[in-house]
Amino acid sequence: AQQQPRRQPQQPAQTEQAPARGEDWYRGQLVELSEVLGGAHYLRIVCDGRGDQRWRTYMRGVIEREPQYNGLLVEGFNRGYRQEEARFPVCDQTTRQMEAELRARGLRIAQGLRARHAGSNVH
């Protein structure tokens, strides 16, 4: 009796993989990042004072890398700032915890954006 050759599992075709993340996704992620940064900026200054410009400075770097989205990014930053300002009028442990959560969320978004850049020639 002859042995049948083993069949290799078929690899999914390129078209069966998840669709490439397009410009709309990218723009949405940038806006979400700007909202997160705006919120984190407010929370940081309400707790540590106006001299702490860490998240505003980071936002400026994003805008410098993506100047075509300047208006959207500034609007998002300001919206995030106002949202957190309405929720956290004073600094307490909850305020500090929310800033840490926003920092983690912003990091996840930034990593996703970097992964997109790493997979393309867009820089």
Question: Where are these predicted regions, by residue range?
Answer:
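Short N-proximal segments of mature Sec-exported proteins
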Residues: Q17-L72, G76-G80
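Compact alpha-helical subdomains of small soluble proteins
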Residues: D52-H123
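Generic signal for short, ordered secondary-structure residues
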Residues: T15-E16, G38, E85, D92
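Compositionally biased, proline/threonine/alanine/serine-rich low-complexity intrinsically disordered stretches
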Residues: A1-W25, A118-H123
